[in-house]
Design a protein with these regions (language model features):
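N-terminal leader/linker segments that precede catalytic domains of diphosphate-processing enzymes
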Residues: 1-209, 217-325
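Juxtacatalytic substrate-recognition/specificity segment
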Residues: 212
């Protein structure tokens, strides 16, 4: 009689894509640094500025010019349009560790860009032919020439009474319309996010601006800059969008926050609805599973792990069932 235990079979031969999953929800996000437990100290996120834009190849420049013409026509006809805001392109980055304590460090080099270039490049990657030509063999630990025209911050806001806020993005925004998202998602903007010591952007200034414009939360009244914690860095491979994920605990209750949004905030059009959810792994996972499409998995995962530990978050993934469609 053979008493040997049956050996496990080989894993599926299909190669894993290496992307983050929020429990049962697969995503196109690749985590490049951070696990939710470690934090970036403010002095360890360093930004630099190269004051010269990259010149687009002819095919991309033609695409950008077409977008500009379309948006100008829409404006003239009284139709929804996108204005050409000044933004930053990420030229390159370096992930390292601080020598004495091995704290996470991130160095970022930026160039000037604009929103129409972003639409013509990153947001056009949904077209298979363009994607195949420029992203057929990509190393996500390197920036992609001409397709790095955005850098953002994504924050889970935690209220004084233990809630977090989810949003449903507006119908007429340029990226991910009507998707369910985290509390604050903001892209670096020139020159308003410029640091105090030069033209390089300050990611904390961007985070503060996003909280003010999208939720009506203001520094020194509702939170301090020291309350903003960045926990991870990565890239959404669908559109080659890179950014930082983090969390912030505010001094305002959920009822006061929702009331302020109802009464009016600067960029209310960016979100069509807010949702208040108790900030626990079980409640957050349940909301994510029942509201699709759901974008902010990496942001919420890092925030939950930082607050409750990885084991409880993974237990919530196992215990909360996906709704039947």
């Amino acid at each position: 009689m053979n008493n040997m235990k049956q050996q496990p079979g080989p894993l599926d031969s299909e190669e894993r894509d290496g992307c983050f999953s929020f429990g049962a929800l697969n995503t196109t996000w690749k985590t490049l640094d951070g696990d939710g437990r470690s934090v970036y100290l403010p002095q360890h996120i360093r930004s630099y500025y190269i004051p010269f834009p990259l010149e687009l190849p002819e095919e991309l420049q033609i695409r950008r010019n077409q977008i500009q013409q379309e948006q100008e026509q829409n404006r003239a006809q009284g139709l929804p349009y996108f204005w050409n805001g000044e933004i930053y392109a990420l030229d390159r980055f370096v992930i390292e560790r601080e020598a004495s304590n091995e704290d996470m460090t991130l160095d970022l080099w930026f160039r000037p860009s604009d929103y129409y270039t972003f639409l013509a490049t990153n947001m056009s990657l949904k077209e298979p032919a363009l994607r195949e030509k420029h992203l057929s063999d990509v190393d996500w630990f390197q920036t992609i020439p001409y397709f790095s025209n955005s850098f953002g911050v994504s924050l889970a806001v935690i209220t004084s009474d233990g809630y977090t806020v989810f949003t449903q993005r507006g119908r007429n925004v340029g990226a991910r319309p009507q998707v369910f998202d985290t509390s604050v998602v903001e892209g670096l903007s020139r020159p308003v996010d410029r640091g105090t010591n030069g033209d390089a952007p300050d990611v904390y200034r961007c985070a503060c601006r996003g909280m003010a414009e999208e939720l009506g939360l203001h520094e020194s009244v509702d939170f301090s800059v020291a309350d903003i914690i960045f926990l991870g860095f990565g890239v959404d491979t669908r559109y080659a969008l890179r950014g930082l994920t983090g969390m912030v605990k505010i001094k305002r209750s959920i009822e006061k926050l929702l009331q302020r949004w109802d009464n009016g905030v600067k960029d209310k059009f960016e979100n069509q609805k807010l949702f208040a959810v108790p900030f626990t792994p079980e409640e957050v996972v349940s909301f994510a599973y029942s509201h699709q499409p759901f974008a902010p998995g990496p942001t919420l995962y890092n925030a939950l792990v930082h607050e409750f530990g990885r084991s409880r978050v993974e237990d919530a993934f196992d215990s909360v069932a996906m709704p039947r469609i």
